[in-house]
Amino acid sequence: MAQIKIEIAYAYPERYYLKKLTVEEGTMIQTAILQSGILQQFTEIDLRENKVGIFSRPAKLTDQLKDGDRIEIYRPLLADPKEIRRKRAEQQAAQAKKK
Protein backbone atom coordinates (compact mmCIF):
# COMPACT_ATOMS: atom_id res chain seq x y z
CA MET A 1 0.00 0.00 0.00
CA ALA A 2 1.03 3.57 -0.60
CA GLN A 3 2.16 5.88 2.18
CA ILE A 4 0.41 9.22 2.79
CA LYS A 5 1.46 12.25 4.82
CA ILE A 6 -0.91 13.66 7.41
CA GLU A 7 -0.84 16.02 10.40
CA ILE A 8 -2.43 15.80 13.83
CA ALA A 9 -3.31 19.04 15.64
CA TYR A 10 -4.37 19.70 19.22
CA ALA A 11 -4.58 23.24 20.57
CA TYR A 12 -4.83 25.17 23.80
CA PRO A 13 -5.63 28.90 23.82
CA GLU A 14 -1.94 29.73 24.40
CA ARG A 15 -0.16 26.99 22.41
CA TYR A 16 -0.71 24.14 20.00
CA TYR A 17 0.69 20.72 19.15
CA LEU A 18 1.21 19.70 15.53
CA LYS A 19 2.73 16.39 14.52
CA LYS A 20 3.45 15.20 11.01
CA LEU A 21 3.07 11.49 10.32
CA THR A 22 3.40 9.10 7.43
CA VAL A 23 0.77 6.36 7.49
CA GLU A 24 -0.60 3.72 5.16
CA GLU A 25 -3.21 4.87 2.67
CA GLY A 26 -6.67 3.99 4.04
CA THR A 27 -5.64 4.38 7.68
CA MET A 28 -8.53 5.38 9.93
CA ILE A 29 -8.41 8.57 12.02
CA GLN A 30 -8.38 6.62 15.29
CA THR A 31 -5.46 4.46 14.17
CA ALA A 32 -3.41 7.51 13.16
CA ILE A 33 -4.11 9.21 16.51
CA LEU A 34 -2.99 6.08 18.37
CA GLN A 35 0.17 5.81 16.23
CA SER A 36 1.05 9.47 16.84
CA GLY A 37 1.58 9.07 20.59
CA ILE A 38 -0.50 12.18 21.32
CA LEU A 39 -2.68 10.30 23.82
CA GLN A 40 0.36 9.63 26.00
CA GLN A 41 1.52 13.25 25.74
CA PHE A 42 -1.90 14.80 26.46
CA THR A 43 -3.60 12.43 28.89
CA GLU A 44 -6.73 14.62 29.09
CA ILE A 45 -7.68 13.56 25.55
CA ASP A 46 -10.42 10.93 25.62
CA LEU A 47 -11.45 9.80 22.16
CA ARG A 48 -14.86 8.79 23.54
CA GLU A 49 -15.45 12.43 24.56
CA ASN A 50 -13.29 14.67 22.36
CA LYS A 51 -14.63 15.37 18.89
CA VAL A 52 -12.34 15.18 15.87
CA GLY A 53 -12.34 16.78 12.46
CA ILE A 54 -10.43 17.13 9.23
CA PHE A 55 -9.68 20.76 8.34
CA SER A 56 -12.49 22.09 10.62
CA ARG A 57 -15.08 19.63 9.30
CA PRO A 58 -16.50 17.08 11.75
CA ALA A 59 -15.22 13.55 11.17
CA LYS A 60 -15.65 10.09 12.67
CA LEU A 61 -12.83 8.06 14.17
CA THR A 62 -13.53 5.41 11.52
CA ASP A 63 -13.13 7.79 8.55
CA GLN A 64 -10.24 6.96 6.25
CA LEU A 65 -7.48 9.49 5.74
CA LYS A 66 -6.28 10.98 2.48
CA ASP A 67 -2.88 12.43 1.67
CA GLY A 68 -2.44 15.87 3.21
CA ASP A 69 -5.27 15.56 5.76
CA ARG A 70 -4.93 17.39 9.07
CA ILE A 71 -6.69 15.64 11.95
CA GLU A 72 -7.88 18.13 14.55
CA ILE A 73 -8.71 16.94 18.06
CA TYR A 74 -11.12 19.39 19.67
CA ARG A 75 -11.15 20.23 23.36
CA PRO A 76 -14.54 20.20 25.12
CA LEU A 77 -16.28 23.55 25.47
CA LEU A 78 -15.72 25.14 28.86
CA ALA A 79 -19.09 26.88 28.77
CA ASP A 80 -22.32 26.48 26.85
CA PRO A 81 -22.48 29.22 24.17
CA LYS A 82 -26.24 29.64 24.72
CA GLU A 83 -25.71 30.15 28.44
CA ILE A 84 -22.98 32.74 27.79
CA ARG A 85 -25.26 34.70 25.43
CA ARG A 86 -28.12 34.57 27.95
CA LYS A 87 -25.91 35.91 30.76
CA ARG A 88 -24.53 38.65 28.52
CA ALA A 89 -28.08 39.71 27.57
CA GLU A 90 -29.07 39.80 31.26
CA GLN A 91 -26.06 41.96 32.10
CA GLN A 92 -26.80 44.36 29.25
CA ALA A 93 -30.44 44.61 30.34
CA ALA A 94 -29.37 45.34 33.93
CA GLN A 95 -26.97 48.05 32.74
CA ALA A 96 -29.67 49.61 30.56
CA LYS A 97 -32.00 49.86 33.59
CA LYS A 98 -29.32 51.71 35.56
CA LYS A 99 -29.07 54.45 32.92
Curated annotation (Swiss-Prot):
NCBIfam families: PRK01777.1 (NF002490). InterPro entries: Mopterin_synth/thiamin_S_b (IPR016155), RnfH (IPR005346), RnfH_sf (IPR037021). HAMAP family: UPF0125_RnfH. It holds the Pfam family Ub-RnfH. Belongs to the UPF0125 (RnfH) family. This is UPF0125 protein PM0166.
